[in-house]
């Protein structure tokens, strides 16, 4: 009977640690890397580079899009930081949990139970906070997607050859070309006419086609960005769904852990299984913290 109770305790405790570890591992390997933020950083720089290539109306939309993308990134990394905080607490608690197996007694068993429930409880709290941040991040992406649709319509109007914006760009090119021709006029009575003729050929044959190609590349850039933002929004929604499942699983195992008797006679194999599960989660936490550029304070204890 005692052995059956011990087996049940080991199963519950091991499952509790592995469930928490699984949620963290999911965040570490999937949720936290689902958006290519380096690409988005480069994109935000490109938004500024193109600022001379669209009308004032389009410029306002671009400013809105840039703000929304930056807001989304802030909230996404806020979620990441929340999970980082859970790791900081969990590594300390699990290291203490492992050390309590030394000269095991009922008091230490009770402390282990408190520790494990604390790890699970903090996990639920922090992952729920991360979930809320991801929701806001997703909303910003969704709003940016709407602005990009409006921008595409605006750019289509701006870049139409009959639009006032397009004509203003052509007039600017012609003015600069003819001013240059006048400044470098060839000597003689027909010099200005010749220079203007050359300028006209350059404007109509080269500069205006170049303008069309440049404007086309600008619109293509924003079309690509629109597709990327839509995909990012879908990815975050999928991430939130996965995280919801993990939070529910932790909640279920926490309830079972609270009603489980911890002070039982463990054999060597049982102890090994529990220590291995705790060490694995500590390693997952360390991996997460190191990947986020901060020094890990707690390593797996020698036991």
UniProtKB/Swiss-Prot annotation:
The keyword RNA-binding does not apply. Disulfide bonds join 87-285. Gene3D superfamilies: 1.20.1170.10. GO terms for molecular function: toxin activity. GO terms for biological process: hemolysis in another organism. GO terms for cellular component: extracellular region; host cell plasma membrane; membrane; periplasmic space. It comes from the Bacteria. Monomer and oligomer. In periplasm, it is present as a monomer, while in outer membrane vesicles, it oligomerizes to form a pore structure that is active. The pore is formed by a dodecamer. This is Hemolysin E. It comes from Escherichia coli O157:H7.
């Amino acid at each position: 009977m005692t052995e059956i109770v011990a087996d049940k305790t080991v199963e519950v405790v091991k499952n509790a640690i592995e469930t928490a570890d699984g949620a963290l591992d999911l965040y570490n390997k999937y949720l936290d890397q689902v958006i290519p933020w380096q690409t988005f950083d480069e994109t935000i720089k490109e938004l500024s580079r193109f600022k001379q290539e669209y009308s004032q109306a389009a410029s306002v939309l671009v400013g809105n899009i840039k703000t929304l993308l930056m807001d989304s990134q802030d909230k996404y990394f806020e979620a990441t930081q929340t999970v980082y905080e859970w790791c900081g607490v969990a590594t300390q608690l699990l290291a203490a949990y492992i050390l309590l197996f030394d000269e095991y007694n009922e008091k230490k068993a009770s402390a282990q139970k408190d520790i494990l429930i604390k790890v699970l409880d903090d996990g639920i709290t922090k992952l729920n906070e991360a979930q809320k941040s991801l929701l806001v991040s997703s909303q910003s992406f969704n709003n940016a997607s709407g602005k990009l649709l409006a921008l595409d319509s605006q750019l289509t109007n701006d870049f139409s050859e009959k639009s006032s914006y397009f004509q203003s760009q052509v007039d600017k090119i012609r003015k600069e070309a003819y001013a240059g021709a006048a400044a470098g006029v060839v000597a003689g009575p027909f010099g200005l006419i010749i220079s203007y003729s050359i300028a006209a050929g350059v404007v109509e044959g080269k500069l205006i086609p170049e303008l069309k190609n440049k404007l086309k590349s600008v619109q293509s850039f924003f079309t690509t960005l629109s597709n990327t933002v839509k995909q990012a929004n879908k990815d975050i929604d999928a991430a939130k769904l996965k995280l919801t499942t993990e939070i529910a699983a932790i909640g279920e195992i926490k309830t079972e852990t609270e009603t489980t008797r911890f002070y039982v006679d463990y054999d060597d194999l049982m102890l090994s299984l529990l220590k291995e599960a705790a060490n694995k989660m500590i390693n997952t936490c360390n991996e997460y913290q190191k990947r986020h550029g901060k020094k890990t304070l707690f390593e797996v204890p020698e036991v």
